[in-house]
């Protein structure tokens, strides 16, 4: 039986509608490690440097917004390209081969840890807006129990006023982030967020849940094979809960207004320590950390733009020393901070690479400045 034109038109419209529905279906991506544990706070980008978002505390991003191929990156794992093919899927990430050799404990009065940090402000409309790198010499006196630090840095920005403003308003804060912490993270979290009844629950298999009176805010995962302890937590959520618990209504409303403006916000905080066979670690066992805020915001044209503010810190040298050895180590670790030297340093010390799309934008920024 032949179809009339009207019937053909109806069927064609139905097919088009079905295809539109299928193409609009969310492609849910989950990131896991080789043991099947979720990897939270993985950055997800398109191959042309546009941010899609960040996986949540359970390693999930609900929709990659129709991207055919995505670039995924996390400070503790190797970056990876993944073909979505219009389907939901699971991505297994490989550990980055970053890490200092085991430190030999010696009867020396001082502990020396050099940390390297990098900061970037990224906007998928303009690229990398600000970039800053620095070195901090951390010296811990084992007798007096005091920590002394000194930091050197260099920075580049798309606009000179941004470089000046950031240095004035946040430079000291960033430098402080690069200092090793004398208290374990668990104690720091409990101390800072005591108002929200933070507790740490052992779930077995080397995994602990960090929660407050409103639910989960993070996880602690011990990887005995790698000899590492990994902390992933959402400081933004914990801070908002603390304002609520303290009854600070004005600050809470201000925070809620900011969250409404900064859509799909993720505060992706991460710390990594080396642990011994008994699961113990000391301040000098610090390996790396990340503080990252990611969100969508409308520009002046009313278009949605993704923004990322990120601070990453890496331990690059450590030793038990006396005063003369300390002086020599500091001298050896001095470096002229040109972009080429920075890239060579990162490669030599196996610093995890930035997402290829961000690295490309960073290269453009540095050339523009030079």
Model region roles, listed by residue range:
Residues 1-29:
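Bacterial Sec-dependent N-terminal signal peptides
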Residues 27-36, 59, 91, 103:
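A short, amphipathic beta-strand motif
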Residues 34-48:
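Short, ordered, surface-exposed loop/turn motifs in non-cytosolic proteins
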Residues 37-39, 61-69:
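Short Pro-Gly-centered beta-turn/loop motif in secreted/extracellular proteins
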Residues 42-46, 70, 105:
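Hydrophobic beta-strand segments
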Residues 50-60:
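Short, acidic Ser/Thr/Gly-rich low-complexity loop/linker segments typical of extracellular
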Residues 71-83:
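A short, solvent-exposed loop/turn motif at the edges and junctions
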Residues 92-370:
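Surface-exposed, low-complexity/disordered segments
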């Amino acid at each position: 039986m032949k179809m009339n034109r009207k019937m053909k038109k109806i069927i064609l419209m139905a097919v088009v509608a079905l295809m539109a529905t299928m193409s609009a279906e969310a492609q849910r991506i989950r990131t896991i490690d080789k043991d099947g544990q979720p990897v939270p706070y993985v950055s997800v980008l398109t191959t042309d440097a546009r941010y899609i978002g960040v996986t949540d505390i359970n390693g999930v991003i609900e929709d990659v917004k129709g991207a055919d191929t995505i670039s995924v990156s996390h400070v503790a794992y190797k970056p990876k390209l993944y073909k979505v093919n219009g389907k939901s899927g699971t991505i297994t990430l490989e550990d980055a081969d970053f890490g200092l050799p085991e430190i030999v404990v010696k009867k020396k009065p001082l502990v020396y840890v050099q940390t390297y940090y990098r900061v970037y402000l990224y906007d998928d409309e303009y690229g990398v807006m600000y970039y800053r790198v620095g070195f901090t010499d951390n010296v811990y006196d084992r007798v007096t129990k005091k920590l002394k630090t000194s930091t050197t840095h260099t920075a580049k920005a798309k606009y000179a006023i941004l470089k000046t403003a950031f240095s004035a308003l946040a430079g000291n804060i960033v430098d402080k982030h690069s200092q090793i912490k004398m208290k374990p993270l668990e104690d720091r979290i409990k101390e800072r967020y005591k108002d929200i009844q933070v507790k740490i629950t052992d779930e077995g298999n080397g995994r602990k849940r960090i929660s407050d009176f409103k639910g989960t805010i993070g996880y602690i995962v011990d990887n005995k094979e790698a000899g590492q302890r990994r902390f992933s937590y959402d400081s933004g959520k914990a801070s908002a809960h603390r304002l609520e618990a303290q009854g600070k209504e004005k600050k809470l409303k201000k925070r809620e207004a900011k969250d409404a403006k900064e859509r799909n916000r993720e505060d992706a905080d991460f710390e990594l320590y080396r642990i011994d066979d008994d699961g113990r670690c000391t301040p000098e066992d610090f390996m790396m950390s990340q503080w990252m805020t990611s969100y969508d915001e409308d520009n002046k044209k009313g278009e949605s733009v993704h923004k990322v503010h990120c601070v990453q810190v890496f331990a690059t040298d450590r030793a038990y020393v006396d005063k003369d050895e300390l002086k020599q180590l500091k001298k050896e670790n001095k470096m002229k901070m040109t972009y080429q030297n920075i890239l060579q340093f990162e490669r030599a010390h196996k610093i995890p690479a930035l997402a290829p799309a961000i690295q490309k934008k960073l290269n453009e920024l540095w050339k523009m400045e030079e």
